[in-house]
Amino acid sequence: MSQLDALREMTVVVADTGDIEAIKQYQPQDATTNPSLILSASALPQYASLIDDAVAYAKARSDDKAQQLIDAEDKLAVNIGLEILKIVPGRISTEVDARLSYDTKATIEKARQIMKLYNDAGISNDRILIKIASTWQGIRAAEVLEKEGINCNLTLLFSQAQARACAEAGVYLISPFVGRILDWYKAAEKKEYAPAEDPGVISVTNIYNYYKQYGYQTVVMGASFRNVGEITEIAGCDRLTIAPPLLKELAESNAPLVRKLEYKGEVKTRPAPLTEAEFYWQHNQDPMAIEKLAEGIRKFAVDIEKLEAMLAAKL
């Protein structure tokens, strides 16, 4: 049995890509996209018609160029999501514009718009996750959306404070990042880490155990992997979203795979929810989390702007 098949027996495997061919090849349960993945997918020739459709949709809706860009961008992300939903049996994660990461109201409105585009295409809410950065404002937006039946995937999650606040808000799923945490520590400490000592692996392990310990239903989906060792060290996590090159490596390996994450203890009484002040105090104790959250939002914003430049040339 391949490591990928062994992993499927203990963890829901998700593909972290917008590439249809890769998704067909590895047959994941779900798929996740983000602005960077949408940007790289939009360069593939098979997506030309999806871009043309998004542009036509935007032109029909408005004469205002700025509004056309926003509409085309949303429609392209949904068009790619619709193609992926033809292949995966589960859910697609589609991300809210990262530039709205500190605006609760605008995030809620954008999430509703994305969901409406899916609904108009005949897709029900239970096949979509709306991806939102795990800022305090994003978490508050998700709390509102979850009550409306719009499930959310809180991403760019680097600190225990972010994870705790998401669970307390009743968020459907979180994506704690592994590889980007490793990147920070390698740069800061100037050293290499074995998978078991990997700070990203330790972070996800702690979050997983915290959620199970307090009986939170929020799904933990490890994300952002730099190597297969990081994946095998958190085998047993609720879900793992994995890029195609690492899915390939897992599929080609027959090395034994041992379940690493499994909580068997008692469920404890939950603490009182974090206040905004407590959230910021705890999150800001972690320089890695501060830097990586801000950097992640900036990087996604840059890729959204590149995507807009590509779309603007067609509008």
From Swiss-Prot:
<protein>
    <recommendedName>
        <fullName>Transaldolase</fullName>
        <ecNumber>2.2.1.2</ecNumber>
    </recommendedName>
</protein>
<comment type="subunit">
    <text>Homodimer.</text>
</comment>
<dbReference type="InterPro" id="IPR004730">
    <property type="entry name" value="Transaldolase_1"/>
</dbReference>
<feature type="active site" description="Schiff-base intermediate with substrate">
    <location>
        <position position="131"/>
    </location>
</feature>
<dbReference type="Pfam" id="PF00923">
    <property type="entry name" value="TAL_FSA"/>
</dbReference>
<dbReference type="InterPro" id="IPR001585">
    <property type="entry name" value="TAL/FSA"/>
</dbReference>
<dbReference type="GO" id="GO:0005829">
    <property type="term" value="C:cytosol"/>
</dbReference>
<dbReference type="InterPro" id="IPR013785">
    <property type="entry name" value="Aldolase_TIM"/>
</dbReference>
<keyword id="KW-0808">Transferase</keyword>
<keyword id="KW-0963">Cytoplasm</keyword>
<dbReference type="GO" id="GO:0004801">
    <property type="term" value="F:transaldolase activity"/>
</dbReference>
<keyword id="KW-0704">Schiff base</keyword>
<dbReference type="GO" id="GO:0005975">
    <property type="term" value="P:carbohydrate metabolic process"/>
</dbReference>
<comment type="function">
    <text>Transaldolase is important for the balance of metabolites in the pentose-phosphate pathway.</text>
</comment>
<comment type="pathway">
    <text>Carbohydrate degradation; pentose phosphate pathway; D-glyceraldehyde 3-phosphate and beta-D-fructose 6-phosphate from D-ribose 5-phosphate and D-xylulose 5-phosphate (non-oxidative stage): step 2/3.</text>
</comment>
<dbReference type="InterPro" id="IPR018225">
    <property type="entry name" value="Transaldolase_AS"/>
</dbReference>
<comment type="similarity">
    <text>Belongs to the transaldolase family. Type 1 subfamily.</text>
</comment>
<keyword id="KW-0570">Pentose shunt</keyword>
<dbReference type="GO" id="GO:0006098">
    <property type="term" value="P:pentose-phosphate shunt"/>
</dbReference>
